[in-house]
């Protein structure tokens, strides 16, 4: 049942043979789009000649967009986002002395997820409202499951945890316009490219480990 090192090695090889050539073509198109003739490593985050898409709106406006998005997505996500926002379970604004990074963590005694981040005015701010919220929704539902799931296994293992977060990034696509307005198409392309490019990177880290 499941898979082992041999199966993962086979998957990595398939990525090398099937995915990497396609990513090379995608990156060539990106470089043509940006006008960078001899791209260096530090150019890898530049996706558009006129700048990458950024979210439009204040903190309150983005959080209101998140509430609208999750209310329209499903009754379960509506309940979830109301709980998270009403109980102030988001600490996402940058401030002096605050540690870097972004993550979701469960507070078992309260059966609540907590989302930590450092918004900086980039598309990554919205990724917090989708990716980290995907982790948080999994924890929120697991903690309230009628199956009484033990705390130790409410959070999935490293090999499956990203299913919930990455899925939420794509499930919320119909609402990305709430955050990016006229730059929505640019964000959709950036998001698709970056998700695709992650595959060989993830495999590289796995092989190193």
Where are these regions (language model features)?
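Cation-handling catalytic/transport regions enriched in His/Asp/Glu
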Residues: 1-209
